[in-house]
């Protein structure tokens, strides 16, 4: 009964050993947001090797846009899978509860179409709704993305790609990390996670 979790752990270890290039060999249905970031790293590295031709720069913007769309599709797909798993577990518990009720002596319980039997003593009983699960997964993916960007910034500092600058409240340092025009306002869209990772990881190859 414990074999499936072990197999999943072995697969994760193999994926880690494969490195960023391993994401390109995955099935589209198995991709995660982290795989999309690995793909952005590989593509950025390949583009840097082509030089600074204007056509390469134009191609880079198109690739970034495609990766952003892929990230959105992957996140939505992962949420759908988690929702289906939760619904499957709920249905299993409902069937088990109906079987117990049917075999036990006593009056028959008539459940409605949107009702399910939950054993309050079961430590594995469902405790969250599908919407709550969706919110948690979205927050988790957002935090993972932010962590990746922070790690890339730290690596750039350590390697000297981004020299720290003195300024009140670290304002100049933020401008070095995320340059903006002097007339930029609050309505201007900031870089997405994909764009940040693409630029940081590409910069390492220079």
From Swiss-Prot:
Q: Kindly provide the name given to this protein in its UniProt entry.
A: RILP-like protein 2
| Family to which the UniProt record says this protein belongs | Belongs to the RILPL family.
List where Basic and acidic residues composition bias occurs: 168-177
Compartmental location:
Cytoplasm, Cytosol; Cytoplasm, Cytoskeleton, Microtubule organizing center, Centrosome; Cell projection, Cilium
Lineage runs:
Eukaryota, Metazoa, Chordata, Craniata, Vertebrata
The annotated regions of Acidic residues compositional bias extend over 8-19
Per the record, the major location class is: cytoplasm
Species of origin: Bos taurus (Bovine)
Residue ranges occupied by any RH1 domain in the UniProt entry: 19-108
Q: Which GO terms describe its molecular function?
A: dynein light intermediate chain binding; protein dimerization activity; small GTPase binding
Q: Which Pfam families match?
A: RH1, RILP
List, alphabetically, the GO terms of the cellular component aspect: centrosome; ciliary basal body; cilium; cytoplasm; cytosol; membrane
* CDD domains reported for this sequence: RILP-like
Every RH2 domain range: 125-197
């Amino acid at each position: 009964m414990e074999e499936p979790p072990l197999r999943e752990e072995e697969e994760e270890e193999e994926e880690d050993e494969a490195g960023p290039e391993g994401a390109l060999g995955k099935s589209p249905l198995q991709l995660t947001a982290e795989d999309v970031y690995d793909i952005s790293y590989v593509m950025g590295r390949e583009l840097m090797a082509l030089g600074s031709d204007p056509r390469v720069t134009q191609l880079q913007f198109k690739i970034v846009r495609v990766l952003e769309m892929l990230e959105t599709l992957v996140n939505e797909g992962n949420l759908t899978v988690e929702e289906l798993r939760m619904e499957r577990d709920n249905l299993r518990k409902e069937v088990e509860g109906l079987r117990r009720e049917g075999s036990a002596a006593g009056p028959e319980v008539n459940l409605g179409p949107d009702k399910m039997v939950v054993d309050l003593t079961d430590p594995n009983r469902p405790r969250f709704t599908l919407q709550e699960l969706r919110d948690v997964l979205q927050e988790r993916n957002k935090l993972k993305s932010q962590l990746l960007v922070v790690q890339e910034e730290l690596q750039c500092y350590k390697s000297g790609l981004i020299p720290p600058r003195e300024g009140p409240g670290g304002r100049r340092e933020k401008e070095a990390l995320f340059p903006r025009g002097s007339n930029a306002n609050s309505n201007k869209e900031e870089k997405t996670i994909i764009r940040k990772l693409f630029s940081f990881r590409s910069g390492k190859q220079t």
